[in-house]
């Protein structure tokens, strides 16, 4: 293996080599302006723990090569000198693929890091970093969280999102906003950790390293997930906008535990939850079904906590009856037109605005509207007896919804229907109780579609009478409408005539006034002309009139006519 290029430095430093998992500090102090360190990068994973010592040009392993500064001064350039501080930065990938036991536990050199203990004070604290753990530790939820001597997880605040209790996947989007939170460190009171964060991380490019900005991403370079994505996947921030009652509750019914050393990091998904994003995605259809179905089962109380909280929150809000939400959507058409089963009504819990319609004849209101107890149509519907007809036919269908003015009574007149039959009242029992006719429009636009109260259909002379009466009513209504239209027309005509007469009077008076003004002005003009003619030979009048004519109008034929008086 050929030695790496030799670098020069203006500051004294010491280099430590780690070999076979044991910390062997073979540092050699060199005079100022005469130090040169050379590192041989590890070739592969098998040679990391066997050969990590420095190789000098003379072939001595574990020693620092002392070269002549005169031999190195020719190859030193300003750009090469700017990257000298990379020599003091430890290689974070030397022990990345080591065993878990050798990281932080079996290898005490990683805790105290002797290679960084003797770095002079001139080196920035950003390079005093611990090494990365193996990949197997990165995939675990709590990586090096309890390791002694480590204030911040991994020593890199930008990578601290891997150690969060809600993080179970190193590629999870929750790392995006990890550095934006004030609790990204397990121990924010540690001054060294705060100093390391303020001075940059080992993966953050420095002032003289602009070429590394595109090669080394950090957690702060990614945007934070949107609120909808964060709520769906469970990546809640600690300053969540939702109340505590909407947080995730584990299956055992226990409240969320407090995780972390500060006591302010609440674990929304439990300490033992694995791959919480997929778990929440699998629970979204279940929660939607719980909201749509009646909440009557109390066997799994912990699982339905979120649904109950949402239902209570909605019921506390006040909505108008037209926009009131319904959590129990009933898709059965017979539930609206059929009778309510007492047992089904006990098991199915409906909102309060449905309960008002169940106390009247056992019928819920159509389309979920609120039923008014003082409604006369409801009283008439409740007093109508349908038990005899239902007993004869064996059917449980209720009559269609009608208004108070549309219900046939004993004193009502026969109404013409579309199929040629008419409604006539009689005391005879109905021969065909199931005979139904399509609803037609009467004066109010509605008619009953079912025979009730012992009414029956009759044909013959009554139909002719009803037809004649219907035509007479139509004729009367037509004449009445014509009379009303003629009356309105006459009223509009009178109004137009009155307005026209008022305009005529106004313009006549104005014309008289203007005529009087014209006459007065003419008289004044005549008097002025008379005065001018009487004083046309006066020298003062001539001079004054000439001066006025010259200054105001100007010299010309008009001025001469003014002077002459005409």
From Swiss-Prot:
InterPro entries: bZIP, bZIP_sf, bZIP_transcription_factors, TF_Aft1_HRA, TF_Aft1_OSM. It is found in: Nucleus. It holds the Pfam family bZIP_1. It comes from the Eukaryota. Residues 466-479 have a biased composition (Basic and acidic residues). Belongs to the bZIP family. Transcription factor required for sexual development and entry into stationary phase. Binds and activates CRE sites (cAMP-response elements, also known as M26 meiotic recombination hotspots). This is Transcription factor atf1. The gene is atf1.
